[in-house]
Amino acid sequence: GTGDYRTLTEAMEGIRAFMDYKVTVLVKKGVYKEKVVLPSWLENVDFIGENVENTIITYDDHANINKMGTFRTYTLKVEGSSITFKNLTIENNAARLGQAVALHTEGDRLVFINCRFLGNQDTIYTGAKGTRLCFLNCYIEGTTDFIFGPSTALFHNCTIHSKANSYITAASTPKDIEVGYVFKNCKLTAAPDVDKVYLGRPWRPYAATVFINCEMGKHICPAGWDNWRNPENEKTARYAEYGNTGEGADNTNRVKWVKQLTRKDVAKYEEPDYLFKICSEWKP
């Protein structure tokens, strides 16, 4: 069609390094089959799609291609910071052949608004300790551990869709970082035949994951959480819930090592300073 660039990679090469002013890249609808890396020198850029359903960045690498491993399978890798993505679909459309990452983040202060993340195992890898991410009004789907990694990330008003009986999150929050994954006002849905999904299992011992005021379908199993075959993780994992609704939110048979938060506990999750105080002040 008409535009200044034909691919995202071309568009990025037209942007100056470490800019102190904001640049907006408008992405016309279409299917962009490319593996995109936004390098660490890219900052202060907004990528805005024309329409989330029809503006698709897709690739199909998976972990079992030539010993590729999980961490090189991404469709979109974001190494830059202070970048916003809006109205885009990021997809890894590999068949179910092992880990296949759609989004891999390394940068800080990344915001995703009204985006869709499509894949199977390991859809979103929040890959860097001490980085902060914000997902607003997004749709995220996958099979196993499809939101995983060490970053601090807020998921607000998102739909989290399980395509298989498995685990939603696998946080690897470092011990010295208080906030890992926070799901607020999200809707947890599943494919028709899915009936046994766990909210999370700890990829590392101090995994931190909280669900607040979320609507949980009946596919969420009564125990809620899994210790990843290691009872020692029950002493260290920081898992909590508050005010959730729906059949999957019944905590009568929840594992004993998950914390049920009080209203006072939850109040601090309203504070951007608390959520994102890891380093410099940031209010997305």
What spans do the regions from the language model cover?
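Sequence-level preference for short, compositionally simple segments enriched
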Residues: 1-284
